[in-house]
Structures are given as C-alpha cells and as structure tokens.
Amino acid sequence: MTTDSDQAQWSVGELLDLFDVRPDGPDRFTAETGGDVGAGQDQRQVVEGTQVVAQAIVAVAKRFPDKSVRSAHAVFSRAVAVGSSVELVLDVVAEGRSTATAIVAALQNGRRCLSVTVLADVPTGDVIRHHLPRPEVAAPANANVSEMPMIGRELRLVDVVDVNSPDEIGPPELYAWLHYDPIPTRDDLAKALVAYFTGHLGISTTMRAHPGIGTSQAHLTVSTAPMTISIAFHEPVCWGGWLLYTHESTQVGAGMSYVRGAVHTEEGELLASFAQEALIRPLRTSDTAIDARSRF
C-alpha cells in the first residue's frame, strides 16, 4: 500500500515521464505503470484509468508525427494494476494526408484492460470560430486548497472543502482549479496532462447532489468505477497558468452516471471538452472478498 509520504514524492515531472511511452516494434508501445507513483490517489493498487488514456494519446501522436491529436474515447473493461508494464497495440484504421484514426488496445499480462479510439488530423485555418465561455466562479486565490499530493500540482475547489465527504451537499457540479509545474511544451504531453484529470472528480460531482453518500465510501460500501472517458481538444492547446475544470452531472440512475465538462484557461480560452460515464452501484457480497485496494 502506498502511504501519504510515498505519494508526496510523486511529481508532475515523473507523471510526464510516465506519459512518454517508448516504441516497442511496429505500431506497438510500452507504458509503465509507475509503481507507487502510478497508484490512484485513494491509495489503492490500481492505476488511474486516465493515466493509460494519456499514454495512448502520446502513442498515437508518436505514430502520426505530422498530425495533432484531436480526440480520444476510452472504454474501460478491467483495472490496470500497479506493477507490470502496459502494452499499447495500435490498430491503424485510416491514415490519410489530413486525418488519421487508430484504436489503441491497452494490455497488461496479455489481458485487454481498455480500448481507446484516437482521432488525429492536421489543423487548418478557421472558417468560423466560437467557444463556450468560462464560468464566472471564484478565482484560484479564493478557492479551497485540496489535498491531492503531487509535487508541482496545486488543486483548489470552488465552494467545496472535502470532495469525498458525504456531508458536501450541493448541485451536481464541481469547479476545480489546477496549476501544474512544469507545463509541457510538447503538444502530445500537454494534451496528455489535460486528459489526465478528466476522470478524477466525475463521480464526486454526481454524488454531491445526494445526501449521505460520497466518494469516501467508494470500494467500501458502494461500488464505483469510470467506464468511459471522452475528450476533445480544441486547438491550440497551450496555457501558462491555472486551468479550470468544470464538471456537470446531467443524469444518474440504473447504476450509471453521466458527467460532461470543459477545461478553460484562467484567461477564458476553451482547451478541451470531456465526458465521463461511471458505475455507481451497491457493493456486491462477492466484492467484499477482494482487497479494497485492488477493486476496480
């Protein structure tokens, strides 16, 4: 099990190193889980799913070096465990002069854990342009500092103190300010870093509207897991300060929730839009036989 002191040594630089997958043959890449660095912030021995999504984005960017990654859609089928490396196998569906598509299979110990469909293209000049304005919320200086240990990352929440607490009741929305140091200059790593946080607060956003339930109960009395993540990047993806992640849960029921969101710069530019589907269900009796640190 990782400890708070272990996680306090995790840095943004190390995270970017994890994202930077290495070639391992034609249309194949190897991604490291990072040991304790890769463990989820809840101390379970399960890698954050969006870490592998970020690695898939970098793999596709390396496969199509003359193009820019525009979107990624991931479907999670099983958890990636801390330890063994992950094999990223690219199925190039189409590769043209302006666009390309690849489906990335992420395998660990020979078993497929997730599939990521990635679209890349060559950006062109605008015919028309508009974007969703940044929400008018409290500035980072007036938001609540959140403890999510990582050297070089600051997280501040608007109108929420403890994102995991069942006592944090409010509308099904969350606004999170993020500051990274360093900010990568490589386009693929910048997009990977933006994508990484898109899955962290979706379930908390949904639970916020329901008294008596919070993500502190996840994997203990309630079963939760992200099932899909989609992200679209809006060129150019570059920033120099704080990022605002907006989350809105539009529906929950029948054991699944849906959250949509946006990533803006502090100046108001829209860098990305994202969506998450997540499982929220009673913990089955059979699940209690599995170590809580290893549950999906």
Where are these regions (language model features)?
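Terminal targeting signals and extreme-terminal segments of soluble enzymes
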Residues: 1-296
